[in-house]
């Protein structure tokens, strides 16, 4: 069985009321009409049993072997939680005006970092539900443990992808306690990259016992001039 804290790569399909709402399978997403071009599909890496997936999935993963596929049905408390009436708030319309938001029924908004859905607008007040949209729902997952990641360089690469999915193929070297990560030229233009680099470094130092230092290398090469440019 998978040990707690081990990095594993998993694939999964999530269903609610018989409809697919989440998947790592690009073709299935397209077939079922939930494809998101901004998503990067394929197996994802997590640290087993550490709360990086739904509680019920975490429990199932710790009971599974590599290569095993399982179907699990999760009650609300082990999925997206029970519906909490206290998370349904009446907010003055003036608050939305102040924030430059035009409230529309059904619109998903974020207030103070918390996402919510507008339920109704009446008499200068807006009813917003801050429960997760799947709160109170039973969900079903098909999950497969694709592999356990043991190689240190691959662990580092997967940690980088966890925080910045666009950095899917960085070069990693590990020598004398230093983990060196070579970033592509476009890396400095990724939003919040400095914060992500700090989080990546902290995660690596936490996971690799013999790592003492993490360095990020950004290399910019001289562009070769074409014959057209030299004319």
UniProtKB/Swiss-Prot annotation:
GO annotation, biological process: protein refolding
Ranges where the record places region CTD: 151-231
PROSITE patterns given in the database record: FKBP_PPIASE
InterPro entries: FKBP26_C, FKBP26_IF, PPIase_dom_sf, PPIase_FKBP_dom, SlpA/SlyD-like_ins_sf
Keywords carried by this UniProt record: Chaperone, Isomerase, Rotamase
Catalytic activity: [protein]-peptidylproline (omega=180) = [protein]-peptidylproline (omega=0)
Ranges where the PPIase FKBP-type domain occurs: 5-92
GO molecular function, one term: peptidyl-prolyl cis-trans isomerase activity
Enzyme class: isomerase
EC number: 5.2.1.8
Classification via SUPFAM superfamilies: FKBP-like (SSF54534)
GO cellular component, one term: cytosol
Pfam families xref list: FKBP26_C, FKBP26_IF, FKBP_C
Region (IF): 83-134
Task performed by this protein: Catalyzes the cis-trans isomerization of peptidyl prolyl bonds and accelerates protein folding. Also exhibits chaperone-like activity.
Domain free text: Contains an N-terminal PPIase domain, an IF (Insert in the Flap) domain and a C-terminal domain (CTD). The CTD mediates dimerization. Chaperone activity requires both the IF domain and the CTD.
Similarity comment: Belongs to the FKBP-type PPIase family.
Cross-referenced PANTHER family: FKBP-TYPE PEPTIDYL-PROLYL CIS-TRANS ISOMERASE SLYD (PTHR47861), LONG-TYPE PEPTIDYL-PROLYL CIS-TRANS ISOMERASE (PTHR47861:SF2)
Subunit structure, interactors included: Homodimer.
Protein name: Long-type peptidyl-prolyl cis-trans isomerase
Species per Swiss-Prot/TrEMBL record: Methanocaldococcus jannaschii (strain ATCC 43067 / DSM 2661 / JAL-1 / JCM 10045 / NBRC 100440)
